[in-house]
Amino acid sequence: MTEPVTVDVRTDPPYPVIIGRGLLGDLGRVLDGRHKVAILHQPTLTQTAEAIRTHLSEKGIDAHRIEIPDAEGGKELPVVGFIWQVLGRIGVGRKDAIVSLGGGAATDVAGFAAATWLRGIDIVHVPTTLLGMVDAAVGGKTGINTDAGKNLVGAFHQPAAVLIDLATLESLPRNEIVAGMAEIVKAGFIADPVILDMIEADPEAALDPSGAVLPELIRRAVVVKAEVVAADEKESQLREILNYGHTLAHAIERRERYQWRHGAAVSVGLVFAAELGRLAGRLDDDTTERHRAILTSLGLPVTYDADALPQLMESMLGDKKTRAGVLRFVVLDGLAKPGRLEGPDPSLLAAAYAEVARD
């Protein structure tokens, strides 16, 4: 990908997702006319955040850096309280903006801060991880973790723009690329099988941040999410398909005290959801096994602790998709044919979990 590509997210109001390299100039244009901008960044991105601050300052914008903790440790209420305090101290107003710089966790907490400060100000996401690029930055879902569960406190708040700078992927460790691939695989199974074909053709090429395959996978995954979000901005029905594999994944993350990477948990969750669909008579054997084969080829986990099901069941009952104590899962009725499974029998859940239980 040599020239920037723009994917329009047709929400109300709409916003662009710009995919390319060297997008600092685009950030300046997106924020043109703002008086103050707060740049929320994770510790390892201080140098990049300072470059953004300098660039915006040269354009006459009063820009400030706010450092937040890395990963899921940053998605907590005390961190949001700290952000609010700094926003108040530097005088960020309703016509100003926040820039989020970092992975999915930074995007989530910065988005929540933007949604709640002065009842909502603009935010521009600059995701620096693969997971952030294809999942957290697009769609307007924000949230923090509490003792009650992952992302149960949050808001819908669409960004003003998303800038995906592909050059940032080249400095990421391989395990970060691998983890982000789980959400791309999910997009392939629920809506765009070409994604799966591309990965199967050459898994190593799919993981190469300097090659041509990964940028196209990112673009396709963003298009899938953009189309679903535009059709169902507030997750009333269709958007639930984006939670394919996530019911078990969130339970695993909670059991692991958020020390597992989100992509790793989603990978196990995808295989579980596929097995659940198969055992319910809704998904064929070949597509079920294809989940396991593709995820394994990318180096993602497809099994979890055999004795964990009771704890995971307790967490899943607290999942935001649960209604009146009835568990609801996204399953497939075929490739790119997502559906819903409500209130499955506990024996069916146990049988599906047995297929991902680690020996």
UniProtKB/Swiss-Prot annotation:
One biological process term in Gene Ontology: aromatic amino acid family biosynthetic process
EC number: 4.2.3.4
CDD domains recorded: DHQS
Binding residues annotated for NAD(+), in chain numbering: 70-75, 104-108, 128-129, 141, 150
CC cofactor note: Binds 1 divalent metal cation per subunit. Can use either Co(2+) or Zn(2+).
Keyword Metal-binding applies: yes
Keyword Ligase included in the entry's annotation: no
GO CC annotations, alphabetized: cytoplasm
Family matches, as InterPro entries: Dehydroquinate_synthase, DHQ_synth_AroB, DHQ_synth_fam, DHQS/DOIS_N, DHQS_C
Binding site for Zn(2+): 183, 246, 262
One MF term in the entry's GO annotations: 3-dehydroquinate synthase activity
Family in the record: Belongs to the sugar phosphate cyclases superfamily. Dehydroquinate synthase family.
Protein name stated in the entry: 3-dehydroquinate synthase
Species of origin: Mycolicibacterium gilvum (strain PYR-GCK) (Mycobacterium gilvum (strain PYR-GCK))
Gene: aroB
